[in-house]
Swiss-Prot record:
One of its GO terms (cellular component) is cytoplasm. NCBIfam families: PRK00321.1-2, PRK00321.1-3, PRK00321.1-5. It comes from Pseudomonas paraeruginosa (strain DSM 24068 / PA7) (Pseudomonas aeruginosa (strain PA7)). This is Recombination-associated protein RdgC. The keyword Lyase does not apply.
Amino acid sequence: MWFRNLLVYRLTQDLQLDADALEKALGEKPARPCASQELTTYGFTAPFGKGPDAPLVHVSQDFFLVSARKEERILPGSVVRDALKEKVDEIEAQQMRKVYKKERDQLKDEIVQTLLPRAFIRRSSTFAAIAPSLGLILVDSASAKKAEDLLSTLREALGSLPVRPLSVKVAPTATLTDWVKTQEAAGDFHVLDECELRDTHEDGGVVRCKRQDLTSEEIQLHLTAGKLVTQLSLAWSDKLSFVLDDKLAVKRLRFEDLLQEQAEKDGGEDALGQLDASFTLMMLTFAEFLPALFEALGGEEIPQGV
């Protein structure tokens, strides 16, 4: 259980939560299949294990792991449009009259209802770690929309969830640009070989570099011309590597082999033990990594009144 992406949310109040209370709350919002006429469903499922008795909350030390599953029926717009056109053409030819918008919309609704039970079903899961002692919720996603879906459903289940996206005092683009420009990152962070540069104008150019020496003259010329670094690949303390963007999304997170080997050793032969060991080691690593990252980026910003 290693997160591949990371969106960080700050709890703005103490979250008095224990595993039993969280388990009971999530049980009120379980994942379930789409009914024949439903476009989508969303709810919580067991992060580890299967079956009705698998817990919806995995607890390790004072960290909680939860998982939400979205199920949706995929009905391509082109299929609906083609079926609607065929129906409209049929009516206009047989009845010798024009089909206007109100009737067309009604026909479209009827077609959707007819096609829905036969539509393909897509399932996707999103994991999140709740760390009350750190005052953080960590979502394994690079999509703010997916994270908000999980958090809003968690809020409904709990009745309240005082949380906001974590922010820092200095604009991330300014810090990332400075790191590339000076060829040196702060603390135990090291610049790697990938970045994205954007012009400051809204319709300006974008330069994406991969497997490139970011200390090169070419990159420095882009910076001199006014481009800002909006994504940058970094390594931290020989433990993990990642890509950080200007919204503080951590993408393509990769834990170094030594950590993974340690988790395998700690987990033993049992599959659940392996998952628990990797989750625990990941969260302990995050407990060191995230404060270091926020400090390197200029410190966490605490909005007034919070």
